[in-house]
Amino acid sequence: QMREALLMQADAGMVGPLLVNPDGSEQRGCRRDIPTPWQIFCVALLFHKFMPDHPRFRNFNHTARPLPDENSIVQAISGACMLVTRNAMDKVGALDRKFFLHFEDLDWCRRFDAAGFKIVFAPHAVVEHTRGVCSRQRPIRVEYHKHKSLITFLRKHFTAYYPSSFMAAVYFVVAMRFFAVVLTKIFGLRKGRPAAWERLMTESTGSEP
């Protein structure tokens, strides 16, 4: 079905399936927008919680939106499962090694779009994905690389379009969130319960350790 989705869309370079959790629910991140510094800022400050339907403040994950009946063009899919064409990969290049962990898929999606290739979400191609299995042993290190990659992503793609003062504010918010996540992970692990900030980070980015 993913291969058919690529063949049906002449200018498609990448396709992703509907990722589901083991319980059958849709997994965040398999259809989403490319997060901008403004969106990161709004999600970090919970603006999307108070105004979820406002176009300037809503979350960039599409999980809360109804599933499309047919293949649809999206800004980004999840790196957990991607099918790309050889032609597109030859023109765009491989994944950027500057991203050690997380956000390499969003970077790739943005580069595919910049090269003129469409990104397709195929809702009828269903893949079960269990998140976080490979990195549960070192959760704080994972969070460090996740937040570091977020800053790398923002610097690479948006510094030319946003005032330096606003970008500095976004980096500060990301750094504060990292420290909050670390603290809640420490206390969450000690008390044996998930941390609220960890859930927020997952919700906002669509990424999981």
Description of each model-found segment:
Residues Q1, P66-V126:
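A short, conserved alpha-helix in the catalytic core of glycosyltransferases
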Residues Q1-R31:
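Conserved donor NDP-sugar-binding/catalytic core segment of glycosyltransferases
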Residues G29, I40, A44, K91-V92, ...:
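Residues that scaffold the ATP/ADP-binding catalytic core of kinase and kinase-like folds
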Residues C30-T36, Q137-I140:
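Short, hinge-like loop/turn segments at secondary-structure boundaries
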Residues I34-Q75:
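Short, flexible, basic/aromatic active-site loop/helix in glycosyltransferases
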Residues R110-K191:
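Active-site-adjacent helix/loop segment of glycosyltransferases
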Residues G192-P209:
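Membrane-interface aromatic/basic loop that binds lipid-linked glycans or pyrophosphate carriers
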